[in-house]
């Protein structure tokens, strides 16, 4: 996998509690029946996907870090249920509906619920603990929008057309899961962005540009893997629709990432004015901006050496086991 480096405006940091959290997380995925057989466990440990929790939330320790690594691990396991290619797509779509009900209606996982639903319920109970109703409502919306992106992904895949770059990015903004993970930063940071500021176009733009940067890095990291498996990727879209060579398309995505980072910094420079206009304390806005930067830096640092994106026999794939089928017991 080719390495890429970008000027992310945050220092490289990793939670000092990573080793303990990683060991405890492996026990959690086993207890949740998310990783069963020996090969699945080997692949999961090899992928190091949950480590993003320690990279993206470097100040988190203890139970807060446990929540971060569990949520991140869950997102990758959920993602790969849609790439298994063994006919489980119908069950995966049903899981999206069940999780949406769990979030919107407050329904609980049942004894028949698939392991991926039970695990999410466990994460969501911890994630929302101690947070305001306003935070819960907006975070539910972010999770539901993420879940709604997966039926679109399956429909586009069944159609077989290569999406143009703009359409590809729109779809990826939903399934990349950045926005729920930004809400997680507030939860483990012990603060909430005031409603008036959170809904401002400036902060929304900062979330968007951070997501754009993470998406671009993800497309670069996963390009070789996606090409080998015949999956959609922004680089391939640029080649198909833009008439670019592979190297030219890679350069274009690199430019997208760096441009998104620069746009983020321009938006951040206006936070003092926003705080004064809305009567919001500048410190909380800076803290939120720092959290977005830290997540972007954490993904950047983790992704550069992630075993997740190797191509040889696809050892980073986590879809070996069906986690979306309902229990027959």
Swiss-Prot record:
Q: How is the cofactor bound?
A: Binds 3 Mg(2+) ions per subunit.
Catalytic activity field: (2E)-geranyl diphosphate + H2O = (R)-linalool + diphosphate; (2E,6E)-farnesyl diphosphate + H2O = (6E)-nerolidol + diphosphate
Q: Where does Mg(2+) 3 bind?
A: 218, 222, 226
Residues that hold Mg(2+) 1 according to the record: 79
Question: Where does this chain carry the motif DDXXD motif?
Answer: 79-83
Annotated keywords: Lyase, Magnesium, Metal-binding, Plasmid
Biological processes annotated in GO: farnesyl diphosphate metabolic process; geranyl diphosphate metabolic process
Gene Ontology molecular function, alphabetical = magnesium ion binding; R-linalool synthase activity; terpene synthase activity
| Function as written in the Swiss-Prot or TrEMBL entry | In vitro, catalyzes the formation of R-linalool from geranyl diphosphate (GPP). Can also accept farnesyl diphosphate (FPP) as substrate to produce trans-nerolidol.
Report what the protein is called: R-linalool synthase
């Amino acid at each position: 996998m080719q390495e890429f480096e970008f000027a992310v405006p945050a220092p490289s940091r990793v939670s000092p509690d990573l080793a303990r959290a990683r060991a405890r997380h492996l026990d959690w995925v086993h207890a949740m029946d998310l990783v069963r057989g020996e090969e699945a466990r080997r692949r999961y440990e090899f992928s190091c996907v949950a480590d993003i929790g320690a990279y993206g939330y470097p100040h988190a320790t203890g139970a807060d870090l446990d929540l971060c690594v569990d949520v991140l691990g869950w997102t990758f396991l959920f993602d790969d249920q849609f790439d298994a290619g063994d006919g489980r797509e119908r069950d995966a779509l049903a899981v999206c509906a069940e999780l949406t009900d769990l979030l919107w209606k407050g329904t609980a996982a049942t004894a028949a619920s698939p392991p991926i639903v039970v695990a999410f319920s466990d994460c969501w109970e911890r994630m929302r603990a101690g947070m305001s109703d306003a935070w819960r409502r907006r975070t539910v919306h972010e999770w539901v929008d993420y879940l709604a992106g997966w039926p679109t992904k399956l429909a586009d895949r069944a159609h077989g057309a290569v999406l143009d770059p703009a359409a590809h990015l729109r779809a990826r903004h939903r399934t990349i899961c950045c926005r729920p993970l930004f809400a997680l930063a507030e939860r483990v940071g012990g603060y909430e962005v005031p409603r008036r500021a959170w809904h401002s176009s400036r902060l929304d733009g900062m979330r968007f540009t951070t997501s754009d940067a993470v998406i671009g890095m993800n497309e670069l990291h996963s390009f070789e893997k996606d090409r080998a498996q015949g999956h959609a990727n922004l680089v391939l879209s640029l080649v198909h629709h833009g008439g670019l060579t592979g190297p030219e398309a890679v350069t274009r995505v690199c430019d997208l990432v760096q441009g998104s980072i620069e746009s983020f910094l321009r938006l951040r420079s206006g936070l003092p004015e926003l705080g004064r206009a809305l009567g919001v304390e500048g410190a909380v806005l800076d803290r939120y901006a720092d959290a977005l930067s830290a997540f972007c830096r954490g993904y950047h640092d983790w992704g550069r050496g992630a075993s997740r994106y190797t191509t040889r026999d696809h050892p980073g794939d986590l879809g070996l086991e069906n986690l979306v089928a309902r229990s027959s017991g």
